[in-house]
Amino acid sequence: MGRKKGLPEFEESAPDGFDPENPYKDPVAMVEMREHIVREKWIHIEKAKILREKVKWCYRVEGVNHYQKCRHLVQQYLDATRGVGWGKDHRPISLHGPKPVAVEEAE
Protein backbone atom coordinates (compact mmCIF):
# COMPACT_ATOMS: atom_id res chain seq x y z
CA MET A 1 0.00 0.00 0.00
CA GLY A 2 1.63 3.15 -1.16
CA ARG A 3 0.63 6.69 -1.70
CA LYS A 4 -1.65 7.54 -4.55
CA LYS A 5 0.09 9.14 -7.45
CA GLY A 6 -0.99 12.55 -8.61
CA LEU A 7 -2.22 15.61 -6.83
CA PRO A 8 -4.97 15.67 -4.22
CA GLU A 9 -8.34 17.02 -5.24
CA PHE A 10 -9.33 20.33 -3.64
CA GLU A 11 -12.43 22.43 -4.01
CA GLU A 12 -11.00 25.58 -5.59
CA SER A 13 -14.15 27.37 -6.65
CA ALA A 14 -16.37 29.76 -4.76
CA PRO A 15 -19.38 28.28 -2.95
CA ASP A 16 -22.41 27.65 -5.13
CA GLY A 17 -25.16 29.16 -2.97
CA PHE A 18 -23.50 32.53 -2.26
CA ASP A 19 -25.51 35.57 -3.34
CA PRO A 20 -23.32 38.73 -3.42
CA GLU A 21 -26.42 40.95 -3.50
CA ASN A 22 -27.69 39.51 -0.20
CA PRO A 23 -24.75 37.81 1.55
CA TYR A 24 -26.66 37.23 4.81
CA LYS A 25 -29.38 35.23 3.08
CA ASP A 26 -27.48 31.97 3.51
CA PRO A 27 -25.10 32.13 6.50
CA VAL A 28 -23.36 28.86 5.62
CA ALA A 29 -22.58 30.06 2.09
CA MET A 30 -21.39 33.40 3.51
CA VAL A 31 -18.91 31.65 5.83
CA GLU A 32 -17.75 29.39 2.99
CA MET A 33 -17.25 32.45 0.77
CA ARG A 34 -15.26 34.19 3.49
CA GLU A 35 -13.07 31.09 3.90
CA HIS A 36 -12.64 30.94 0.11
CA ILE A 37 -11.50 34.58 0.01
CA VAL A 38 -9.05 34.03 2.88
CA ARG A 39 -7.67 30.89 1.23
CA GLU A 40 -7.13 32.73 -2.06
CA LYS A 41 -5.41 35.62 -0.24
CA TRP A 42 -3.04 33.18 1.50
CA ILE A 43 -2.20 31.56 -1.82
CA HIS A 44 -1.33 34.94 -3.36
CA ILE A 45 0.73 35.94 -0.32
CA GLU A 46 2.70 32.69 -0.38
CA LYS A 47 3.34 33.02 -4.13
CA ALA A 48 4.72 36.52 -3.50
CA LYS A 49 6.98 35.17 -0.73
CA ILE A 50 8.36 32.48 -3.04
CA LEU A 51 9.04 35.07 -5.75
CA ARG A 52 10.75 37.34 -3.20
CA GLU A 53 13.10 34.49 -2.24
CA LYS A 54 13.87 33.89 -5.93
CA VAL A 55 14.67 37.59 -6.39
CA LYS A 56 17.00 37.56 -3.35
CA TRP A 57 18.77 34.47 -4.68
CA CYS A 58 19.10 36.00 -8.15
CA TYR A 59 20.55 39.23 -6.71
CA ARG A 60 23.16 37.27 -4.75
CA VAL A 61 24.14 35.02 -7.65
CA GLU A 62 24.23 37.64 -10.41
CA GLY A 63 26.02 40.36 -8.45
CA VAL A 64 26.47 43.58 -10.41
CA ASN A 65 24.48 42.25 -13.39
CA HIS A 66 21.30 41.77 -11.37
CA TYR A 67 19.59 44.74 -13.04
CA GLN A 68 19.51 42.97 -16.40
CA LYS A 69 19.44 39.31 -15.37
CA CYS A 70 16.82 39.51 -12.60
CA ARG A 71 14.47 41.99 -14.24
CA HIS A 72 11.89 39.34 -15.19
CA LEU A 73 11.77 38.01 -11.60
CA VAL A 74 11.40 41.51 -10.17
CA GLN A 75 8.55 42.23 -12.58
CA GLN A 76 6.81 38.98 -11.60
CA TYR A 77 7.27 39.85 -7.91
CA LEU A 78 5.85 43.36 -8.37
CA ASP A 79 2.87 41.97 -10.28
CA ALA A 80 2.30 39.38 -7.55
CA THR A 81 2.33 41.98 -4.76
CA ARG A 82 -0.15 44.35 -6.40
CA GLY A 83 -3.58 43.99 -4.88
CA VAL A 84 -2.47 41.51 -2.22
CA GLY A 85 -3.43 42.37 1.30
CA TRP A 86 -6.08 42.14 3.95
CA GLY A 87 -7.57 45.64 3.61
CA LYS A 88 -11.14 46.33 2.65
CA ASP A 89 -10.06 48.25 -0.43
CA HIS A 90 -9.29 45.00 -2.26
CA ARG A 91 -12.60 43.30 -1.49
CA PRO A 92 -15.71 43.69 -3.62
CA ILE A 93 -17.80 46.69 -2.58
CA SER A 94 -20.83 44.47 -2.09
CA LEU A 95 -19.12 42.77 0.85
CA HIS A 96 -18.15 45.87 2.82
CA GLY A 97 -20.05 48.83 1.40
CA PRO A 98 -22.73 50.79 3.20
CA LYS A 99 -26.01 48.97 3.56
CA PRO A 100 -28.88 50.44 1.51
CA VAL A 101 -31.45 52.27 3.60
CA ALA A 102 -35.07 51.43 2.91
CA VAL A 103 -37.10 54.60 2.33
CA GLU A 104 -40.78 54.41 3.21
CA GLU A 105 -43.07 56.38 0.97
CA ALA A 106 -45.75 58.52 2.60
CA GLU A 107 -49.18 57.97 1.13
From Swiss-Prot:
Organism: Arabidopsis thaliana (Mouse-ear cress)
Protein's cellular compartments: Mitochondrion inner membrane
Record Pfam families: NDUFB10 (PF10249)
GO biological process terms on file: photorespiration
Known role: Accessory subunit of the mitochondrial membrane respiratory chain NADH dehydrogenase (Complex I), that is believed not to be involved in catalysis. Complex I functions in the transfer of electrons from NADH to the respiratory chain. The immediate electron acceptor for the enzyme is believed to be ubiquinone.
UniProt GO cellular component terms: mitochondrial inner membrane; mitochondrial membrane; mitochondrion; respiratory chain complex I
Quaternary data: Complex I is composed of at least 49 different subunits.
UniProt keyword terms in alphabetical order: Electron transport, Membrane, Mitochondrion, Mitochondrion inner membrane, Respiratory chain, Transport
Residue ranges of the TM segments: none
UniProt-recorded name of the protein: NADH dehydrogenase [ubiquinone] 1 beta subcomplex subunit 10-A
Membrane topology: Peripheral membrane protein
Region (Disordered): 1-23
